[in-house]
């Protein structure tokens, strides 16, 4: 039996502002944590005695756990209440952050990152929902604008703050800073939102669907993360993980298609616009997320950047979204959304290609940040137009499920994109390293003349060869990264074709 409650009156004055700060801070905390570790991977890996490839599990484990938690958030909120679930999520997110900061080996850190990701899943949708519920109807657009600013600002602050912490303090502080923020959120919400819980009802949890989702997505992510270390399909472990993942995902599709209470509402894919929007978001975010993890590591490994400078090199991508996003939100409905998305994808393609032909170990800081700055135009015209296209033609009662599906695929593609990018980068680096090394022999006149000059500085042939090997490694890493950037550019050009199959009008009452 559902527990019904009268709807409390909207908040006003200082109380409303304090609640806005608390809910926005929760969103900021979650978004910050999704990017703050990007520049810290070399530092964390070195401290815990792991390779850089293994260190990326710190990112992907959080992402895949976050993705799994998103589809079940709605049902949990119906069952125990939005406010109660939000407070529990903030509490355990803060506690898991504390445990991450105290981890002494990679396995423990990854375990608590998984817990942290599971607790992070409900934070964004619930903070948004609670904000709208407690604002007067005429001010809800303003509330969403304030809330959205945290979504934009946090990913900019993450790499810079993470770099500063790693260079000046212990890496554990990149997780520990969540604790005081969590305490502030809990204190304000417990005090100001008391008695404002949402209605609850004893909805059934789709345990078979959830189990298949965990096995399918979890198995896929572990397979991608461990594949390189275990030599891919020459390993029985990788084969087993692949079989389990494929069978689970196929079974999940069959189960969810026939279930009366699905975790993933696959019926949404009957809408042409939803399908095109989700495919576009998933593919675009796969390449985008891979690149934003690759860049800081590339700068640190090939150019000797410290963590904070790697973060500063990434930051310009957030300048234009900060300035343009409010304008797109206000005037975007006057423009064909396909034009905005096309502009976004073409800007992505131009910037990735620009980076692929200019990046080398000798590039200066200006050469690095210029493509990042202009890519900000692409980011600003990406999420809102594609979300609008995805939701067009859907009835109002499908919006919650559509939002859940969109966030699920976006978050999952981010983790998969990171794993695929780092795997491809490593494999191509090995190939180019061997190809470049093969040109180094006594019959190469360039090598002979260079080695004679270098011998004066290093005093021995072994010193010369060691320096040459370091140079080959730097060049191999750069060449491999540039290949990935070119691949991303091609993918975004192809996506510009896909988006034009979407059918206007792009409103809730349109026909999808």
Curated annotation (Swiss-Prot):
It is found in: Cell inner membrane. SUPFAM superfamilies: MFS general substrate transporter. It is a multi-pass membrane protein. The keyword Protein biosynthesis does not apply. Induction: Growth phase-dependent transcription is induced by tetracycline. Expression may be controlled by both RpoS and the Mar system. It holds the Pfam family MFS_1. InterPro entries: EmrB-like, MFS, MFS_dom, MFS_trans_sf. PROSITE patterns: MFS. Its main location: membrane. GO terms for cellular component: efflux pump complex; periplasmic side of plasma membrane; plasma membrane. GO terms for biological process: bile acid and bile salt transport; DNA damage response; response to antibiotic; transmembrane transport; xenobiotic detoxification by transmembrane export across the cell outer membrane; xenobiotic detoxification by transmembrane export across the plasma membrane. Keywords: Cell inner membrane, Cell membrane, Membrane, Transmembrane, Transmembrane helix, Transport. Residues 1-8, 52-53, 163-172, 226-234, 295-307, 360-364, 508-512 are cytoplasmic. Disruption phenotype: Mutants are more sensitive to nalidixic acid, mitomycin C and other stresses such as hydrogen peroxide or UV irradiation. Part of the tripartite efflux system EmrYK-TolC, which confers resistance to various drugs. Belongs to the major facilitator superfamily. EmrB family. This is Probable multidrug resistance protein EmrY.
């Amino acid at each position: 039996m559902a527990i019904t409650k009268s709807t409390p009156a909207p908040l006003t004055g200082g109380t409303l502002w304090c609640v806005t700060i608390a809910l926005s801070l929760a969103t900021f905390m979650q978004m910050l944590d999704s990017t703050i570790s990007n520049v810290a991977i070399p530092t964390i890996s070195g401290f815990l005695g792991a390779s850089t490839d293994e260190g990326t599990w710190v990112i992907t484990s959080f992402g895949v756990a976050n993705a799994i938690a998103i589809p079940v958030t709605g049902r949990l909120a119906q069952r125990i209440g939005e406010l109660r679930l939000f407070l529990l999520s903030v509490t355990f997110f803060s506690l898991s952050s504390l445990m991450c900061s105290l981890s002494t080996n990679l396995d423990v850190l990854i375990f608590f990152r998984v817990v942290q990701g599971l607790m992070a899943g409900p934070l964004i949708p619930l903070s948004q929902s609670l904000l709208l519920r407690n604002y007067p109807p005429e001010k809800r657009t303003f509330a969403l604008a304030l809330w959205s600013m945290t979504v934009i600002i946090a990913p900019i602050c993450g790499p810079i703050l993470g770099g500063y912490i790693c260079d000046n303090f212990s890496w554990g502080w990149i997780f520990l800073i969540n604790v005081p923020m969590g305490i502030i959120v809990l204190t304000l919400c417990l005090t100001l939102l008391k008695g404002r819980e949402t209605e609850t009802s004893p909805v059934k949890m789709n345990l078979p669907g959830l189990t298949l989702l965990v096995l399918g997505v979890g198995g896929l992510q572990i397979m991608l993360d461990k594949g390189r270390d275990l030599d891919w399909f020459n390993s029985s472990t990788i084969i087993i993980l692949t079989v389990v993942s494929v069978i689970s995902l196929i079974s999940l599709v069959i189960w969810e298609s026939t279930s009366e209470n699905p975790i993933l509402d696959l019926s949404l894919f009957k809408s042409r616009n939803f399908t095109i929007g989700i495919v576009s978001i998933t593919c675009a975010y796969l390449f985008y997320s891979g690149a934003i993890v690759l860049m800081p590591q590339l700068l640190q490994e090939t150019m000797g950047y410290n963590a904070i400078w790697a973060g500063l090199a990434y930051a310009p991508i957030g300048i234009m979204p900060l300035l343009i996003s409010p304008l797109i939100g206000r005037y975007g409905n006057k423009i064909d959304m396909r034009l905005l998305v096309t502009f976004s994808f073409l800007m992505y393609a131009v910037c990735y290609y620009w980076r692929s032909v200019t990046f080398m170990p000798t590039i200066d800081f200006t050469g690095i940040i210029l493509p990042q700055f202009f890519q900000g135009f692409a980011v600003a015209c990406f999420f809102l137009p594609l979300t609008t296209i995805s939701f067009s033609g859907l009835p109002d009662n499908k919006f919650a499920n559509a939002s859940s599906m969109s966030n699920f695929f976006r978050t999952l593609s981010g983790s998969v994109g990171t794993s695929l990018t780092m795997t491809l980068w490593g494999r191509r680096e090995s190939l180019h390293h061997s190809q470049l090394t093969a040109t180094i022999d006594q019959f190469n006149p360039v090598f002979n003349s260079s080695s004679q000059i270098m011998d004066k500085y290093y005093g021995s042939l072994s010193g010369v060869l060691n320096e040459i090997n370091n140079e080959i490694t730097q060049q191999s890493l750069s060449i491999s990264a540039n290949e990935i950037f070119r691949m991303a550019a091609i993918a975004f050009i192809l996506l510009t074709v896909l988006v034009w199959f979407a059918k206007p009008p792009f409103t809730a009452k349109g026909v999808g």
